[in-house]
């Protein structure tokens, strides 16, 4: 699905295992400083004390399910996300997923822009 100059079709809701024990990350596009992923969560959350700290700007939309995001260094309270909600997270804005719905898969579309973790500091 990631071949340059090739038309690619897919369905963001295909191949979802509602009983998966681990989150699933599928790369849809990766080139020229842009990464687009489908993420499927089935009740997973960030471990206690863990914060994402990515060198890239992130834009995430929740397409199905429900989730709660927390931000470490902002006045923003934990934010419950429902289908159709999206958030833009600046580079190095420490955040975590504190909850995803265990009864229905949470399907995310994530777009990362900027240096890759190998080029920058990546995740903490």
Can you describe what each PLM-predicted range is?
Residues 35, 68-70, 96, 107:
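General beta-strand recognition
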Residues 82, 91-118:
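Ligand-binding loop in jelly-roll beta-barrel domains
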Residues 1-51, 123-124:
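A short, N-terminal "cap"/entry segment at the start of jelly-roll beta-barrel domains
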Residues 33, 74, 102-104:
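Short strand-connecting beta-turns/loops that link adjacent beta-strands
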Residues 53-54, 59-83, 98, 120:
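A short beta-strand-loop-beta hairpin characteristic of the jelly-roll/cupin
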């Amino acid at each position: 699905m990631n071949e340059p100059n090739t038309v690619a079709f897919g369905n963001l809701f295909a191949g979802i295992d509602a009983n998966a024990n681990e989150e699933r990350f599928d790369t849809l596009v990766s080139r020229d400083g842009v990464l687009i992923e489908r993420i499927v969560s089935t009740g997973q959350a960030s471990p206690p004390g863990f914060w994402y700290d990515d060198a890239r700007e992130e834009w995430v939309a929740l397409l199905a399910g429900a989730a709660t995001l927390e931000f470490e260094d902002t006045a923003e309270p934990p934010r419950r996300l429902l289908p159709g909600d999206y958030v833009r997270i600046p580079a190095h804005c420490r955040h975590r997923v504190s909850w995803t719905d265990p009864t229905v898969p949470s399907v995310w579309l994530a777009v990362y822009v900027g240096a890759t973790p190998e080029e920058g500091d990546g995740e903490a």
